[in-house]
């Protein structure tokens, strides 16, 4: 599950939270204390780290860590 660990590290760094808090069910705003700007910056960091593009309409649907993992798994090799 190296992908999850990579994503977890990016999220923990971007949101300045302990990696243990970054679980698949953790919601960025509700559980990790992110605001809308934090979420935008997080999406940009994930795009850069994984060399993908997350369109705005997809980014709006990403509310928790599991959503990010699924999106990257589904689109990284596309």
From Swiss-Prot:
Pfam families documented for this protein: PP-binding
Q: Which InterPro entries match?
A: ACP, ACP-like_sf, PKS_PP-bd, PP-bd_ACP, Ppantetheine_attach_site
GO BP terms in the entry: lipid A biosynthetic process
Q: What does this protein do?
A: Carrier of the growing fatty acid chain in fatty acid biosynthesis.
Cite the annotated pathway: Lipid metabolism; fatty acid biosynthesis
User: Domain named Carrier: which ranges?
Assistant: 1-76
Question: What GO molecular functions are on record for this protein?
Answer: acyl binding; acyl carrier activity; phosphopantetheine binding
Origin: domain of life = Bacteria
**SMART domains assigned to the protein according to its UniProt record, in alphabetical order:** PKS_PP
Compartmental location: Cytoplasm
Coarse class of the protein's main subcellular location: cytoplasm
How is it modified post-translationally?
A: 4'-phosphopantetheine is transferred from CoA to a specific serine of apo-ACP by AcpS. This modification is essential for activity because fatty acids are bound in thioester linkage to the sulfhydryl of the prosthetic group.
Known PROSITE patterns for this protein?
CARRIER, PHOSPHOPANTETHEINE
**What protein family does this chain belong to?**
Belongs to the acyl carrier protein (ACP) family.
One GO cellular-component annotation of the UniProt record comes to: cytosol
Q: What is this protein called?
A: Acyl carrier protein
Keyword tRNA processing appears in the UniProt entry: no
Which of UniProt's keywords are assigned here?
A: Cytoplasm, Fatty acid biosynthesis, Fatty acid metabolism, Lipid biosynthesis, Lipid metabolism, Phosphopantetheine, Phosphoprotein
Taxonomy of origin reads: Bacteria, Pseudomonadati, Campylobacterota, Epsilonproteobacteria, Campylobacterales
Residue positions, PTM O-(pantetheine 4'-phosphoryl)serine: 36
